Amino acid sequence: MKRTYQPSRVKRKRTHGFLVRMRTKSGRRIIANRRRKGRKRLAV
């Protein structure tokens, strides 16, 4: 049986990257929340 996590750097960036987050209103909210919380990494 195949494992569910098949890492791919490209896919990771394209779905969870910073630029992708900034593209939508909700994505910007995610970044803002992470900034407020003081996360070291805002996005992948």
Swiss-Prot record:
A GO term from the CC aspect: ribonucleoprotein complex
Please give the PROSITE patterns that the UniProt record associates with this protein. Answer: RIBOSOMAL_L34 (PS00784)
Among the Pfam families in the record, one is Ribosomal_L34
What GO molecular functions are on record for this protein? structural constituent of ribosome
UniProtKB keywords = Ribonucleoprotein, Ribosomal protein
Q: Which GO terms describe its biological process?
A: translation
Database matches in Gene3D superfamilies: 1.10.287.3980
Write down the NCBIfam families for this protein, in alphabetical order: rpmH_bact
In the record, the note on similarity to other proteins reads: Belongs to the bacterial ribosomal protein bL34 family.
What the entry lists under PANTHER family is as follows: LARGE RIBOSOMAL SUBUNIT PROTEIN BL34M (PTHR14503:SF4), MITOCHONDRIAL RIBOSOMAL PROTEIN 34 FAMILY MEMBER (PTHR14503)
State what protein this is by name.
Large ribosomal subunit protein bL34
Native species: Kosmotoga olearia (strain ATCC BAA-1733 / DSM 21960 / TBF 19.5.1)
Identify the gene encoding this protein. rpmH
